[in-house]
C-alpha cells in the first residue's frame, strides 16, 4: 500500500479540485453559449421592422396589400399620370390620353416621348412591379388588421416593394365590364412586404404606419432616402 506525505496529499487534492473546477466552468460556458444563441435565433424575425430615418418609437408595419378594382382615370400629362407602373422587366407603363382622344396604357419611361400605336399596350395587362403610383377615388377609409385610416384628402398613393427580387408587386389592369374603347381602367394589386407612401392635397408626403400602442393607423412625415 502506497504511503503519501501530508504535503503530497495537499498538492494532489488541490490539483484534483482545480481540474474538477475547470471542467465545471467549461461545461457552464458551453451551456450558456448554446442557450444564448438559441434565444437570439428564436426571437429574431427577419424584416419584422423597417429602420426609419426620422426619430420615432413607433414600429413600421410590413404590409400585405390587396387592392381590387381601383378605378383609374387617364391623364393628359405624363408628368402627372394617374397611374405609373415600374415593371420588374425595366418597363414603365403610364395610363394616358392626348388631345381629348383616348390612347391607352403607354409603355414609355420618357414623358417627352410622343405616344404612338407602338407604345400602347392592350388590356387586360398584368405583370410584376417594383413600385406602383396611382391617383384614384379610393374608399374613404382603409383598414388593416382592425386599424383604420381616413383617406379623404389623399391625392396620390405609392406602393413600394421592400424586396423586389423575392416579393414583387403582382398587378393587373383591365377595363372591367367597360368596352375596350373606354378611358377607364381598373387596377388590382396583390403584394407582400410593401411600404405605402401617400401624398395629401397640400403636397405633404407621409408614410402609412400602424401604431400598435394606440391601435390606429397613422401618417408619419416621409423623407426619401438614397438606396
Swiss-Prot record:
Primary location group: secreted
Entry PTM: The N-terminus is probably cleaved by the prepilin peptidase EppA, which recognizes the class III signal sequence.
Entry's induction text: Expressed under standard laboratory conditions at 35 degrees Celsius.
Keywords for this protein: Fimbrium, Secreted
Knockout or disruption consequences: Disruption of the gene does not change the piliation compared with the parent cells.
Motif extent (QXSXEXXXL): 8-16
Subcellular location: Secreted; Cell surface; Fimbrium
Cellular component GO terms held in the UniProt record: cell surface; extracellular region; membrane
InterPro entries on file: Class3_signal_pept_motif
Propeptide: 1-7
Record remark on domains: Contains an amino terminal motif QXSXEXXXL, which is part of a class III signal sequence.
Name this polypeptide is given: Probable minor pilin MMP0600
Organism: Methanococcus maripaludis (strain DSM 14266 / JCM 13030 / NBRC 101832 / S2 / LL)
